[in-house]
Amino acid sequence: MTESKSKEELAQARLDARAAKDFAKADQLRDEIAALGFEVIDIAGGFEFRAKERFPRYASTRDIKAIKVDGDIAITIIVDGFITDAIDAVRTIKANTKTPIIALVIGEPAELVDEIDLQFQIVAITENFGWGENTNALLKNLSTKYMLIMDPSTRFLGDAIAPVLTELDKGEFSAVGWRGGLVNTDDEWRSVDDKGAGEVDVLFGYFMAFNCADATNAGGFNNRAIYYRNADMEFSLRLRNVNGRLLQMDLPLEQGRHHGYYDTKEEFREVQSKKNYDRILERFRGKSAILSPRR
């Protein structure tokens, strides 16, 4: 679809495709019209349009229905305010890959709605149920083999999906990401050391892709994790606890201002981060057998 094509032009092309019995093309054109916010209705001698919701809206993550996505992998972003950053992130993705994108938006999507097309869709919820539960809702309702969760502050500088998909398809790693590290066992698991590309103990949610079946087998993300910080580490160790391996890669990405950290109230940030990390220490500290080889 090009920007110059109106819904009328697309609808006529759909009629022509149906007449030629090219039903796959007709379905694609129907979806393009839907992305513009309309349902096309066949009538005698032509067509008419009915306005439709451009995205679903739910009261709870438990109400979210299956998210239709083509392909083996989908990029997911949780958007809680800072819409301009989310728009920038979506545009850099579109400029570098055709991979489907789903934004789980808390509250009103505002101008982000203007980015909806065949590649990008929005799922909105009226209340924030926390990072862990929001991410699990995406994991549960996506039909893809792999899911990628990224922060709105992450920007694509090139195609970061192709190399990730190549590694995941090998089946050696349950998760692949951009930033991560090895748990520092010398300080009682209280820090993580970035050792660069290679096998790691934990990956961070700036950009992390994983096998959905492996993630589900590990128990997914912790619904008690209201805040993102350290929840990604907890998920990583859950994967390693069921023999999942994690790979950190050098990828064409950069990070802008991380609003989830810098623009969150300090007391909330520190309290929730500590709660997440305390769970890590309680469950995993001392279980060195689940860690990756030291390097």
Give the label of every model feature segment.
Residues 45-47, 248-268:
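Active-site donor/metal-binding and catalytic loop motifs
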Residues 53-91:
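N-proximal low-complexity "stem/linker" segments adjacent to membrane-targeting elements
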Residues 91-100:
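Short, acidic, metal-binding catalytic loop of nucleotide-sugar glycosyltransferases
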Residues 125-142:
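Glycine-rich, basic loop-to-helix element that forms the pyrophosphate-binding segment
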Residues 147:
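Short aromatic/hydrophobic "clamp" motif used to bind/position activated sugar donors
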Residues 155-189:
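Conserved donor NDP-sugar-binding/catalytic core segment of glycosyltransferases
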Residues 191-213:
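A recurrent flexible, glycine/aromatic-enriched loop bordering the glycosyltransferase active site
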Residues 216-240, 244-248, 252-254:
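Donor nucleotide-sugar recognition loop
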